[in-house]
């Protein structure tokens, strides 16, 4: 008897799962850092241009290949033509390499989540807490294994009952969390040792205002490469995910 393929039950599940893949630590942590480092609005403009051109093309191609072949990332390219089989292995290799450090970061997140649930975050706010945690011989490994086990369990349940179901639960909560972080950051103020007060709105201005100071052709290429690498993280393209 032919087994039924696991698939999304509707478009909402696919959109939420795709958004969950995009809105990860690569965007929450890496994007603001690159934006501040690479000229604020200048980086943002280059990134948006790449997303609307190069990124859109890659994303639609990824989705089209998946819909056409109805195969996993390993076999999709071979279904199109046998000579492209090696591309399937390359797309499988990328998330495998990413998982080596995402699993560690996932363990950190679980650790902090457990601390905030148990002690309202007071313990995690102490000086050198993070350093003492990551230098521990046992604790980081335990939380990493818990994260990997939980992830494997979701994947084992399949697309509809695993990835789609948990995306519908987690993504609304993540959206509210991001909104809360944004509001908190914009209303934040800090007084330095010299008496200078810095606010979240000043940080937003740095984030959005283009800074052309020291811009050369070499520097522009560096910003372009940073924006391109961020695009792959944001859209999860060419990684066997879409």
Please report, for each region that a protein language model flagged, where it lies by residue.
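Central hydrophobic cores of alpha-helical transmembrane segments in multi-pass inner-membrane proteins
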Residues: 26, 51-63, 67, 73-74, ...
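Transmembrane helix-boundary motif of multi-pass solute transporters/channels
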Residues: 10-48, 240-242
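Alpha-helical transmembrane segments and their helix-start/interface "positive-inside/aromatic belt" motifs
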Residues: 40-47, 82-100, 164-175
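Hydrophobic alpha-helical transmembrane segments of multi-pass membrane proteins
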Residues: 16-22, 48-53, 90-101, 146-153, ...
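Membrane-interface "cap" regions at the ends of multi-pass membrane proteins
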Residues: 1-29, 58-63, 67-79, 83-89
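Extracellular loop-to-transmembrane helix junctions
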Residues: 6, 35-61, 139-140
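Inter-helical loop and helix-membrane interface segments of multi-pass membrane transporters/permeases
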Residues: 2-6, 34-38, 71-90, 103-162, ...
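Selective recognition of specific alpha-helical transmembrane segments in multi-pass small-molecule
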Residues: 49, 53, 57, 169-190, ...
């Amino acid at each position: 008897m032919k087994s039924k393929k696991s698939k999304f039950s509707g478009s909402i599940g696919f959109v939420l799962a795709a958004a969950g893949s995009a809105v990860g630590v690569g965007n929450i942590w890496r994007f603001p850092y690159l934006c501040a480092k690479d000229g604020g609005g200048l980086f943002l403009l280059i990134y948006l241009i790449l997303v609307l051109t190069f990124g859109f093309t890659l994303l639609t191609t990824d989705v089209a290949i998946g819909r056409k072949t109805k195969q996993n990332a390993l076999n999709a390219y071979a279904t199109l033509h046998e000579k492209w089989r090696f591309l399937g292995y390359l797309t499988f290799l990328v998330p495998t390499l990413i998982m080596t450090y995402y699993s560690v970061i996932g363990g950190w997140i679980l650790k902090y989540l457990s601390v905030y649930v148990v002690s309202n975050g007071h313990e995690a706010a102490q000086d050198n807490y993070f350093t003492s945690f990551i230098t521990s011989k046992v604790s980081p490994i335990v939380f990493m294994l818990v994260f990997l086990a939980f992830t494997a369990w979701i994947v084992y349940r399949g697309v509809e009952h695993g990835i789609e179901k948990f995306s519908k639960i987690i993504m609304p909560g993540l959206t509210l969390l991001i909104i809360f972080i944004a509001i908190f950051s914009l209303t934040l103020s800090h007084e330095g040792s010299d008496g200078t007060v810095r606010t979240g709105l000043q940080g937003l201005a740095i984030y959005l205002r283009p800074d052309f100071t020291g811009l050369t052709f070499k520097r522009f290429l560096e910003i372009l490469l940073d924006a391109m690498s961020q695009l792959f993280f944001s859209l999860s393209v060419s990684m066997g995910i879409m």
